[in-house]
A protein has these predicted regions:
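Alpha-helical segment of the N-proximal tetratricopeptide repeat
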Residues: 47-76, 132, 136-144, 368, ...
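Residue signature of alpha-solenoid helical repeat architecture, marking inter-repeat boundaries
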Residues: 48-49, 82, 87-89, 124-125, ...
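TPR repeat positional signature
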Residues: 54, 88, 95, 130, ...
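Solenoid-like repeat scaffolds
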Residues: 79-80, 162-164, 205-207, 236-244, ...
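TPR/TPR-like (Sel1-like) alpha-helical repeat modules
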Residues: 85, 92, 96, 104-123, ...
Length: 536
């Protein structure tokens, strides 16, 4: 997709926002900064001087999860210096999508082949040997090893290297990333692993303010409600460190969304989407860099009261560069489903087309349809939706288990939510509240998804509908603690405070909602806030 084909999203005022963030985030190249704006990486090797800049560019790309381009760049180094062992290590690492997906047997075999090639070249320095040995621990040929086993072996090797080389920014940053990878899968030790990663990265962030991996991994390490504030400095830096990376332009939004900084998130993701589209045009990146940014962009528009802009993002899914028609339809269906539920447009949610979505997002669409039907009073439609969702969840969990992902042992949150609203529609309020409370507690324990409707907010909504505002406002307060500045959290808290006779509390929440949304907001509920504030 060329920028002139972005339809309404790239016209008029929005064109300003698409183009300027990229220019504004680029560092001044006259000061001696590298020509590729990917951050400063010093990665000494025994390879020839000719390929050393290529190696460092490839490592910088690796730190920003630009895996396709990183692999190509390492391969280029290997072509120009066939004895460069670390280039083979790099090609293996570019196959290891640590936070995105588990490598299958084919990928493990390909990675192991590269590591064996690196070992045969007998790298000259202990540092190179260390990186290659650590990667070998992950790619080792043991079919019975689980993914977590491989991560633990890899992380343990990096921990030893970092202890032997304290302050080494490359060993330290890769070690911290391995801890975040473990935290994503080893739920019993998640908090401890994240805390260790943060403790490793904090001093490195001060010592190496332009290093892409340190800032990037700090954002991932702190991507939970209780840690998000610790990641704000890294979030503010990362896009400026590596403005030529679409992922670097997007990643700050993980923290901005956690902290309810909607305008920051919007600017971040508009820039990331434009950069991702350009990279896809050049065949340097896959389409998901665009769609992931659009996911966060849509959510941020909704939370800042900009319904029309959120709907433009749905339409923009038709123009994602490099995506198949099936992928475009699936992404569009997913965004439409979340939008309908966020806006409480129950008829719209219940009428969402299912066939248009691809398998990955099918359960989200059916979840929205089931809740929409239940809240719209269509019991038959809700029951059918819940039944279909239960099957989709079972299939999803089978695929997940087959791929090596560890299950939580808990009923899926989306299924609990749909079942709860069905029970509520049937008049079984105690059962409904019990289901939502269990879903909310599970979500809170695991950090919750940053761009989804919190189950606890649904619980608060249900309590308010049951005319139990004192209980509802307690739940809304918890929602706003974990997900600050959520539109419906603030609106629900204001309504609950008003229902309990707390005029000062209602005024405070309505005022906060009006401030968060600003002049460009168009959600009709804002009229309620303005009317209340005008009366006071």
């Amino acid at each position: 997709m060329h920028r002139h084909r972005l339809s309404t999203l790239a016209s008029g005022v929005l064109f300003f926002f698409l183009v300027l963030p990229l220019a504004a985030l680029r560092a001044d190249t006259s000061s001696g900064a590298p020509p590729d704006q990917l951050g400063r990486v010093n990665f000494p090797t025994s390879c020839t001087a000719e390929v050393q800049p290529t190696i460092e560019k490839a490592v910088a790309l690796l730190h920003s999860f630009q895996y396709t381009e990183s692999k190509k760049t390492f391969a280029d180094a290997s072509t120009h210096d066939p004895k460069c062992a670390i280039a083979h290590w790099g090609k293996a690492m570019a196959l290891f999508y640590q936070l995105w997906e588990f490598p299958n047997d084919k990928t493990l075999k390909a990675g192991r082949k590269e590591i064996e090639a690196a070992q045969k070249l007998r790298p000259a320095t202990p540092r190179e040997q260390g990186f290659i040995t650590a990667a070998a621990a992950f790619f080792q040929k043991k079919s019975k090893m689980t993914h977590v086993d491989r991560l633990q072996a890899y992380s343990a090797a990096l921990e030893r290297l970092y202890r032997e080389n304290p302050g080494d920014v490359e060993f330290g940053s890769f070690y911290a990333l391995s801890l975040v990878s473990l935290a994503e899968e080893d739920h019993d030790n998640e908090i401890a692993d994240r805390q260790k990663a943060i403790a490793t990265l904090e001093p490195l962030l001060q010592q190496h303010p332009d290093h892409p991996g340190v800032a990037h991994y700090m954002i991932h390490a702190t991507d939970r409600p209780e840690f998000a504030a610790q990641g704000l400095e890294a979030a503010r830096r990362y896009a400026a460190i590596a403005p030529d990376s679409a992922h670097a332009l997007h990643m700050p939004a993980h923290i901005f969304v956690r902290l309810g900084l909607w305008q920051d998130s919007i600017a971040s993701n508009i820039a990331a989407n434009a950069s991702g589209a350009h990279a896809a045009e050049m065949h340097l990146a896959e389409s998901h860099y665009q769609t992931h940014a659009m996911d966060f962009l849509s959510y941020s528009y909704l939370q800042s009261g900009q319904e029309a802009k959120a709907r433009e993002v749905i339409e923009h899914a038709n123009h994602v560069v490099g995506a198949s028609e099936e992928m475009k339809a699936g992404d569009r269906a997913y965004l439409a489903a979340r939008t309908a539920v966020e806006l409480h447009h129950w008829k719209e949610a219940a009428a969402l087309p299912v066939a248009a979505s691809r398998e990955d997002w099918q359960s989200t669409v059916v979840w929205a349809r089931a809740i929409g039907a239940a809240r719209g009073g269509d019991l038959a439609g809700a029951e059918s939706g819940v039944k279909e969702l239960a099957q989709l969840v079972a299939d999803r969990e089978k695929r997940s288990k087959k791929s090596g992902y560890a299950g939580s042992g808990e009923k899926a949150t989306d299924l609990r939510e749909a079942e709860a609203w069905l029970a509520f529609a049937k008049g079984k309020s105690d059962e409904a509240l019990q289901e939502l409370r269990a879903a909310a507690d599970h979500q809170d324990k695991n950090g919750g998804e940053s761009v989804s409707v919190p189950a606890r907010e649904m619980l608060a909504d249900m309590l308010l509908e049951l005319k139990r505002p004192s209980e509802a406002i307690a739940e809304y307060r918890t929602v706003l603690k974990n997900s600050p500045n959520r539109f419906d959290g603030l609106l629900g808290a204001a309504r609950s405070a008003q229902a309990t006779g707390d005029a000062r509390g209602a005024q405070s929440y309505y005022a906060q909602l009006a401030q968060v949304c600003g002049a460009g907001a168009d959600r009709p509920e804002l009229a309620e806030a303005k009317t209340y504030l005008a009366q006071k």
